Amino acid sequence: MTPHINAKIGDFHPQCILCGDPLRVSYIAKNFLQDAREITNVRNMLGFSGKYKGKEISLMGHGMGIASCTIYVTELVKTYQVKELLRIGTCGAISPKVGLRDIIMVTGASTDSKTNRIRFLNHDLSATPDFELSLRAYQTAKRLEIDLKVGNIFTSDFFYSFETHAFDLLAKYNHLGIEMEAAGLYATAMELSAKALCLCSVSDHLITKEALSPKERIESFNNMIILALEMMG
């Protein structure tokens, strides 16, 4: 047990899928897993363990932003010996290379947060995913005939007040979208010798102002859930 997770030791399996929204975690458990059981609920940040096609797998919410995400990642790895962490979330696109419903495999995460600089003695940390997980995601997407987009993401500490004039600069440097956790996830996994990867479904486009309806978001997210479960299974 930790300050934020009340699961018993052994409740979490070595492979864990992460979502910012605990209700998405519950949705996946109820609609995609067999023998799913709730194993933690501190602060209503839900976690489940179950099976997908006979393979044991766990699910965990992590909240919004680097600070919240890294708390849960640290406790999952250090206390519960989780070895592989796959975050599936949404992002806002800033590049013409991607559109609504596209799934992005995040190969690198820049950030306006100081957390990684503090962690890395004020140097620039290359926040990147595990190669094996990335390869599995790419190969699984090919098998499922999912057109997986590959590129960098910008992880921001801001949801409402990010500098919109920077969108063109980010796109120039092959940043496909903006979200709030990947840079922290990757850095924490690197520090703790765990494997991590982030997949993001494009829910809105910050340049064209297009956005999915709530129903369309669910349908789009389902494709990413299946990709995640298939590659981790």
From Swiss-Prot:
Catalytic activity: a purine D-ribonucleoside + phosphate = a purine nucleobase + alpha-D-ribose 1-phosphate; a purine 2'-deoxy-D-ribonucleoside + phosphate = a purine nucleobase + 2-deoxy-alpha-D-ribose 1-phosphate
Binding site for phosphate: G20, R24, R43, R87, I88, G89, T90
Gene Ontology MF: a single term: purine-nucleoside phosphorylase activity
Key words, A-Z: Glycosyltransferase, Transferase
Family annotation (PROSITE patterns): PNP_UDP_1
Pfam family, one: PNP_UDP_1
Domain of life assignment: Bacteria
Cellular-component GO terms for this entry: cytosol
Binding of a purine D-ribonucleoside, residues: H4, E179, M180, E181, S203, D204
GO terms under biological process: purine nucleoside catabolic process
Documented EC number(s): 2.4.2.1
Active-site residues, Swiss-Prot/TrEMBL: D204 (proton donor)
Keyword Transferase: yes
InterPro entries: DeoD-type, Nucleoside_phosphorylase_CS, Nucleoside_phosphorylase_d, Nucleoside_phosphorylase_sf
Site residues (Important for catalytic activity), renumbered to this chain: R217
Similarity comment: family membership: Belongs to the PNP/UDP phosphorylase family.
Subunit structure: Homohexamer; trimer of homodimers.
Job description of the protein: Catalyzes the reversible phosphorolytic breakdown of the N-glycosidic bond in the beta-(deoxy)ribonucleoside molecules, with the formation of the corresponding free purine bases and pentose-1-phosphate.
Protein name: Purine nucleoside phosphorylase DeoD-type
Originating organism: Helicobacter acinonychis (strain Sheeba)
